[in-house]
């Protein structure tokens, strides 16, 4: 089991909290709650996500996911977080900083999902606001990017409420639910962040 244990210090141990939420890296002990929330939210999430692998919600699939997460964190490529309500430990959703680029770029791409029972209640806006100081602070990023399907109004609102600027449209940018879809591109610079 040590294979899936993430370091207790350094970037892998990031666990920002605030406004009643805790964000931390996924652990094997999260499997049951994660699989239940994803399964119960499948119809809600499907229009906005890539096609799920056939074994995505299995324990073995979750183990592979954790292994990949550990490798990505160690290589400074990606930082996944599960979002919990702090008062009762309820899992709300997840946020991942992916495609981390260093050197002269110092940027990464944010993606997120929220379980259907917690959608449209401000949880993801709050979670992103809690995470941004960590991304600009501890991870020392200059720029955070995001992309969303133009019809995903709730996601657009999350980004705009968190200070992201709409920067353009990327045609047929990502394969979502089996279809290459246009995406609005958003960015947030460190100097524009009011954390």
Regions found by a protein language model. Give the residues of each.
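Conserved GNAT-fold acetyl-CoA-binding loop/helix
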Residues: 46-67
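Short loop/turn motifs at secondary-structure junctions and domain boundaries
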Residues: 71-76, 164
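Acyl-donor (CoA/ACP) binding surface of acyl/acetyltransferases
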Residues: 1-33, 37-47, 80-195
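A generic secondary-structure signal
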Residues: 68-72, 134
């Amino acid at each position: 089991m040590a294979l899936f244990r993430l370091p207790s210090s350094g970037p892998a141990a990031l666990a920002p909290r605030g406004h009643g939420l805790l964000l931390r890296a996924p652990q094997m002990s999260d499997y049951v709650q994660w699989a239940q929330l994803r399964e119960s939210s499948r119809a809600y999430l499907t229009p906005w996500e890539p096609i799920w692998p056939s074994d995505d919600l299995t324990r073995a699939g979750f183990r592979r996911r954790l292994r990949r997460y550990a490798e990505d964190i160690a290589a400074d490529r990606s930082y996944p977080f599960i979002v919990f309500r702090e008062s009762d430990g309820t899992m709300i959703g997840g946020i991942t900083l992916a495609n981390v680029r260093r050197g002269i770029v110092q940027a990464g791409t944010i993606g997120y999902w929220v379980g259907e029972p917690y959608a449209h209640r401000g949880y993801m806006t709050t979670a992103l606001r809690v995470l941004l100081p960590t991304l600009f602070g501890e991870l020392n990023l200059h720029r955070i990017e995001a992309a969303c399907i133009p019809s995903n109004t709730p996601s657009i609102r999350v980004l705009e409420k968190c200070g992201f600027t709409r920067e353009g449209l990327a045609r047929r940018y990502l394969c979502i639910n089996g279809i290459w879809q246009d995406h609005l591109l958003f960015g947030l610079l460190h100097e524009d962040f009011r954390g």
